[in-house]
UniProtKB/Swiss-Prot annotation:
Keyword Ion transport set for record: yes
GO molecular function terms listed in the Swiss-Prot or TrEMBL record: proton-transporting ATP synthase activity, rotational mechanism
Membrane topology: Multi-pass membrane protein
Protein's name according to its UniProt entry: ATP synthase subunit a, chloroplastic
Gene that encodes the chain: atpI
Compartments it resides in: Plastid, Chloroplast thylakoid membrane
Entry keyword set: ATP synthesis, CF(0), Chloroplast, Hydrogen ion transport, Ion transport, Membrane, Plastid, Thylakoid, Transmembrane, Transmembrane helix, Transport
Pfam families: ATP-synt_A
Superkingdom per UniProt: Eukaryota
CDD domains named in the record: ATP-synt_Fo_a_6
Highest classification ranks of the organism: Eukaryota, Viridiplantae, Chlorophyta, core chlorophytes, Chlorophyceae
Length: 238
């Protein structure tokens, strides 16, 4: 088989399973997640070594990213409460951003595994659901820590008959977050894989560049919505 066709082969729904305590884990997702965490750890180390009062070099870049995340949190959550949520939103944004870009830029397809293929961690629904559930837990924590059990009064405001709708909303938020991210990243990698198989030289390049752009947008959308949900939980309801 043509080597390009082997690289372009798309394996949908196939997984490299690891057995742990009687449970099957998606091994390829854990491998690529560790790669992403390793990249973030290295970048963090480089950005926090030999700090200077007047930043230069890589410190400039890390401070720019930190300011961007801080401004995002401030815009979405508000002046009063945003600082304590900067680490959470920063972690979510950076993990998704690097995960998405790793799928677009790293040559995962050149690495053979016993079954399935390596891809961005966010290409697996388990990863995106976990991130969405963390977001749900965070906004419940935000609301309860500020208002106590009075937080749950929001379910019957402005009228008691809205209770089922308000409860349903808490289930649809993580669903929409997880499926939006998963669908976009999976679709991008499938389109690139098919185009590489059909026209392997030039045509896939613009699609790959578009994928890099949309990958960054998806990380921003996820972090922005997470901040908006936290702000909603913290806000006073009347």
């Amino acid at each position: 088989m043509n080597p390009l066709l082997e690289i372009a082969e798309v394996s949908v729904g196939q997984h490299y399973y690891w057995e742990l305590g009687g449970y099957e884990l998606h091994g390829q997702v854990l491998i690529t997640s560790w790669v992403v965490l390793g990249i973030l750890a290295v970048l963090s180390f480089l950005g926090n070594t030999n700090l200077k009062s007047t930043p230069d070099g890589f410190q400039n870049f890390t401070e720019l990213v930190t300011e961007f995340i801080r401004d995002l949190a401030k815009t979405q959550i508000g002046e009063e409460d945003y600082l304590k949520w900067v680490p959470f939103l920063g972690t979510i944004f950076l993990f998704i951003f690097v995960s998405n870009w790793s799928g677009a830029l790293l040559p995962y397809r050149l690495i053979e595994i016993p079954n399935g293929e390596l891809a961005a961690p966010t290409n697996d629904i388990n990863t995106t659901v976990a991130l969405a559930l963390l977001t749900s837990i965070s906004y419940f924590y935000a609301g309860i820590s500020k208002k106590g059990l009075g937080y749950f009064s929001r379910y019957v405001e402005p009228a008691a008959f809205l209770l089922p709708i308000n409860v349903l909303e808490d289930f649809t938020k993580p669903l929409s977050l997880s499926f939006r991210l998963f669908g976009n990243i999976l679709a991008d990698e499938l389109v690139v894989g098919v185009l590489v198989a059909l026209v392997p030289l030039i045509i896939p390049i613009p699609i790959m560049l578009l994928g890099v752009f949309t990958s960054a947008i998806q990380a921003l959308v996820f972090a922005t919505l997470a901040g908006a949900y936290i702000n909603e939980a913290l806000a006073d309801h009347h």
